[in-house]
Design a protein with these regions (language model features):
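Loop-helix junctions at membrane interfaces
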Residues: 1-224
Length: 224
């Protein structure tokens, strides 16, 4: 596939996902947009400057951490967009627009999955941090999307290698197996980081969103 076709495909993928996001989540607050942007930037930095590359285009990095973390702190759409935008842009800056196509889809899937498990299944926002099983639910919610990526990454990677990069079937199949192993290590390490960061950041975020207490009006002094 030509470079122009890669860019067009990436543009189509972005438009479709953004359109679906708007339909699902019609409004974003200023705080949500700001936090999503910060997490996208952290994803980009974690990938571009703190990664260990492996043969076949895969690499060890913690960029997915901020995708899942945003999904747990906010919601699945915000998490998916943070990871999709940040890590797809990282691929582009690294000179890999072909990888950016599948990256955008894969990271959005991570965010949506983590958000669905955290807020639809476990309803983490409504749980007290001292509730029985709270830590286990946080771990499962974080791991859900990240471990799903262990399977979706090689699957989409196969089609990317064959239909975008034009590689032979046997080569693409071998590369997806290598990617699957590295992705599993990424997922486990990212899950640990997400859980630790979420437990630390959730109380601070709740305090920031809590309306200030109304000050009691001073009682009028009695006339002498």
């Amino acid at each position: 596939m030509s470079t122009t076709a890669m860019w067009l495909l990436l543009a189509v993928v972005i438009v479709v996902i953004l359109f679906g996001s708007v339909l699902y989540k019609r409004t974003f607050t200023t705080k949500e947009l700001a936090l999503t942007g910060v997490m996208a930037a952290l994803s980009l930095v974690a990938y571009l400057f703190f990664r260990v590359p492996f043969y076949g285009g895969s690499s060890f990095h913690l960029g997915n951490t901020f995708t899942a973390l945003t999904a747990l702190l906010l919601d699945g759409v915000s998490g998916g967009l943070a990871g999709a935008i940040g890590l797809a842009l990282a691929d582009i800056l690294a000179g890999d627009p072909g990888y950016a196509v599948t990256t955008f889809v894969l990271k959005f899937i991570i965010g949506i999955t983590c958000g669905a498990v955290a807020h639809k299944v476990f309803k983490l926002r409504e749980l007290d941090k001292h509730a029985p099983g709270y830590l286990a639910k946080v771990i499962v919610a974080a791991a859900s999307g990240l471990l799903l990526n262990v399977f979706t990454d090689p699957f989409l990677g196969y089609f990317r290698n064959v239909y975008i990069f034009g590689q032979e079937y046997t080569i693409a199949k071998a590369l997806t197996k290598i990617t699957g192993g590295v992705t599993f290590v990424n997922s486990v390490a990212s899950t640990v980081c997400v859980v630790l960061l979420y437990l630390a950041l959730r109380p601070a975020l709740e305090r920031a969103n809590r309306p200030p207490k109304a000050q009691k009006a001073s009682e009028p002094k009695a006339d002498k």
